[in-house]
Structure formats: C-alpha cells, structure tokens
C-alpha cells in the first residue's frame, strides 16, 4: 500500500478525510548503535507518498481520538485479526474480513507509478538474463547460473529476487518449480532459467530456455522450442482489454496440440478430441499466466482461471484452473500479466498417462526421444492496454538469444 519496506511500521488510512498516515518506530539508541537508525519522520515524509508521519507510540491514542469523534459502532478495518491494536474503547469495532478482498480488487489494476516499477524490475531481469547467455558456454553447474544471475541483479541495485531462482538443466526442466540448482550442465541439452528481480517491492517474472552453445543441440530441442515460441506469440498478440484470459489459455493448448500432432507426438485424434481428453495436460500442466505486482503471483478480486464451479460445466481443461490467478472475467487496461506457455517431458507425467485412456493419443515410443529435452518455457510480463498490449520484458529469445550465446563463446575462445 505504501512501498515502505522498513520493519515495525504501521499504516492507517482515514477514508472520510482521505488521510494516509505512516507510523514509524520510535528512536531506540541501542538499536541505532547496533543496526543503524530506523526510519525517521522527516525521511518518511520525503521518501513516501503519505499525508503525515508519526511515531508508533502515538498509534493507540490516535485511534482513541478517532473513535471518540465517531458514532458508536464505527468500524476500523484491519488486514489480520492479530493486528488489532489494544485500545480501551468498548464500542469500537474491528473488521478483519472485508479489507483484504477490497485491496485485492484494487491491486489488479496498476497505475503509472506501479507500471514504472515493474518495468524497472524487468529491465534489471533482462540485463541478468543477458549476462547468463553471454557466459553460459563457459558454465559448468546450475549453481553458477544462479550465482551469476544474483550477482547481476545486486550490482544493479536489486538485492531481492521476486521468487526463488529456477535454473533447471536437462530433465530437471520438466520439474516446474525446480530450485535445487546444484547439478552439472555437462551432457544436458537445454537450461530453463526462470528468474526475476524485485524493484522497490514490485516483481518481475521472466523465463528463458536456451542451449549451452549457439546452436540447437538436437532436432527435438529446436522443435519443442519452436512450438512454445508460437504458443506465446499467438497468445500475446491477442491480448487486449475485453479479452477473456481463459480463452488465451485454451488457445495455447490448441496450438500445442496442433504442433504435437505435426511432430507425431499426438496421434489418432482431432484437436478437439485430444483437447477434451486432457492429453495436452500431460505436456502443458500449468496455467498460461497470472498477475504480476507486489507479489510475483499477485492477488486480485476474481480469478479468470478459477471461475465458479458451475461455470466450468462443458469447459475443456477443467483441471487447469488452479495455477492461474488472474482475476476478473476479462482483461482490463492496467493489468500486468504473464504469458508463460511451456511444453514438458516429465517421466512421472508420462508414466501416469500410460495408465489412462488418453494414452491412445500419445506415441509413447516417439515421445521417449524428447525426454532429454526436459522442458521449454518462455515467459514475459505483458501490460494490457486499451487497444492491445505492451511487452515489458525484453530479455533475448529465439535467434537473438543464440547470437548472444555465440558472442560470449567467441570471447572465451
């Protein structure tokens, strides 16, 4: 709500007077000697868009003064029940149920300042992803990728990551949230790097999948990358205010099925039949995307991918709704959403699929040749505008990505 990252601060907003007050810790000499001074009143007023700053010790009295000027039964809204201040005022009511839903609804639309922070987070992430591409040909372990990414972000002033870095090589890329990042790169075809910097509390969420050398290591790797690239491009270009995000999610599955039919991985059915069977979930098990903001999976009022249960009757891919957290039935200008299709070759998922009727649509013998690819995911953060979209992520992909890998390899030759 305020962008204040300092500990032990409190924030109140008086709706009637439209007054935003930040309460900062009282000065503590011992704490200041050991840890440095805490945020002061003058600094708080200068740094943050607030109406007034006060010390924490005045909070309870301010609440009592506020309550004394209000009618009996006036309500103070708090985020959590354990945040209620202890005040001796029997007629004061606290509500911890209604504030979070209201805040969630407000957070789905970003203003210009918020978009600027997300844009800067993406710029830093792009720089870090590019540094990895320049150095990947000389790296030996997933841990080096993680360390280099962190180093690049911190050097640009972003000390915090939006989420735990995923640096998954080979078959590890088939694990959606792989974070061990401790295996050697030798003999692996691709690396899936899902990593994004945080800037002033706002997140970025960026994924690139790439080889260790400036060429595709196999026909299978190139084919899968091309499929995912098309899935992403087709979905992004359809983003606009009023578009239903769930339709883009289903479109991504249809494109995946079409392309996997072309490769021979799917067989014996039409796009509609395979979609209805759920077979595409074996290879694309997560949602197309989510909001980005103060959290990497940002909150919102209502999720497009988590409709009311009755609204799912007759919809394909019912099992996909949980991973997506987009709210509101249709996209609106000011939303920032990820578009992150992926195709994965998980041994566990394939073994499970063999036991199901949908296995008749999958050429298990052929798909075994793709297991060393692991998985491919490409993810950008996209701003919804009134007449379309703006991609806030500019990390290289495709041919430009390979060119940078090649430049780095030549410098080390």
Swiss-Prot record:
Mn(2+) 1 binds at residues 205, 340, 379. GO terms for molecular function: manganese ion binding; metalloaminopeptidase activity. Mn(2+) 2 binds at residues 194, 205, 379. Pfam families: AMP_N (PF05195), Peptidase_M24 (PF00557). Keywords: Aminopeptidase, Hydrolase, Manganese, Metal-binding, Metalloprotease, Protease. Binds 2 manganese ions per subunit. Its EC number is 3.4.11.9. Its cofactor is Mn(2+). PROSITE patterns: PROLINE_PEPTIDASE. The keyword Protease applies. InterPro entries: Aminopep_P_N, Creatin/AminoP/Spt16_N, Creatinase/aminopeptidase-like, Pept_M24, Peptidase_M24B_aminopep-P_CS, X-Pro_dipept-like. Transmembrane segments: none annotated. GO terms for biological process: proteolysis. It catalyses: Release of any N-terminal amino acid, including proline, that is linked to proline, even from a dipeptide or tripeptide. PANTHER family: XAA-PRO AMINOPEPTIDASE 3, XAA-PRO AMINOPEPTIDASE AN0832-RELATED. Catalyzes the removal of a penultimate prolyl residue from the N-termini of peptides. Belongs to the peptidase M24B family. This is Probable Xaa-Pro aminopeptidase UREG_07123. The lineage of its organism: Eukaryota, Fungi, Dikarya, Ascomycota, Pezizomycotina.
């Amino acid at each position: 709500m305020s962008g204040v990252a300092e500990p032990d601060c409190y924030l109140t907003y008086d709706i009637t007077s439209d007054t935003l007050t930040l309460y900062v810790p009282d000065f503590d000499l011992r704490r200041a000697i050991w840890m440095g001074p805490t945020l002061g009143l003058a600094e708080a007023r200068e740094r943050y868009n607030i109406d007034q700053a006060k010390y924490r010790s005045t909070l309870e009295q301010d609440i009592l003064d506020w309550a004394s000027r209000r009618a009996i039964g006036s309500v103070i809204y708090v985020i959590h029940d354990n945040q209620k201040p202890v005040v001796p005022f029997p007629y004061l009511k606290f509500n911890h149920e209604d504030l979070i839903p209201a805040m969630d609804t407000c957070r789905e639309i970003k203003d210009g300042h918020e978009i600027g922070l997300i844009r800067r987070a993406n710029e830093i992430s792009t720089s870090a992803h590019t540094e990895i591409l320049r150095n990947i040909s000389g790296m030996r372990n997933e841990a080096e990728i993680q360390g280099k990414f962190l180093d690049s972000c911190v050097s640009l002033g972003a000390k915090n990551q939006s989420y735990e870095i995923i640096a998954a090589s080979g078959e590890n890329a088939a694990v959606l949230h792989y974070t061990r990042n401790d295996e050697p790169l030798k003999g692996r075809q691709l690396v899936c790097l899902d990593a994004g910097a945080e800037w002033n509390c706002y997140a970025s969420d960026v994924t690139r999948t790439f080889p260790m050398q400036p060429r595709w290591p196999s026909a299978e790797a190139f084919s899968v990358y091309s499929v995912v690239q098309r899935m992403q491009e087709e979905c992004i270009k359809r983003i606009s205010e009023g578009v239903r995000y769930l339709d883009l999610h289903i479109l991504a599955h249809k494109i995946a099925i079409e392309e996997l039919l072309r490769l021979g991985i799917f067989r014996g059915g039409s796009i509609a039949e395979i979609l209805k069977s759920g077979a595409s979930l074996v290879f694309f098990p997560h949602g197309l995307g989510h909001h980005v903001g103060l959290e990497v999976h940002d909150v919102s009022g209502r999720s497009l991918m988590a409709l009311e249960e009755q609204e799912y009757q007759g919809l394909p891919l019912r099992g996909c709704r949980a991973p997506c957290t987009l709210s509101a039935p249709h996209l609106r200008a000011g939303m920032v959403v990820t578009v992150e299709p992926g195709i994965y070759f998980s041994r566990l998922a394939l073994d499970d699929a063999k036991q199901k009727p949908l296995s008749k649509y999958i050429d298990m013998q052929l798909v075994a040749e793709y297991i060393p690819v692991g998985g491919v995911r490409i993810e950008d953060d996209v701003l919804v505008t009134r007449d379309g979209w703006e991609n806030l992520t500019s990390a290289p992909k495709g041919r430009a990505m390979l060119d940078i890998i090649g430049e780095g390899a030549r410098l080390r030759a």
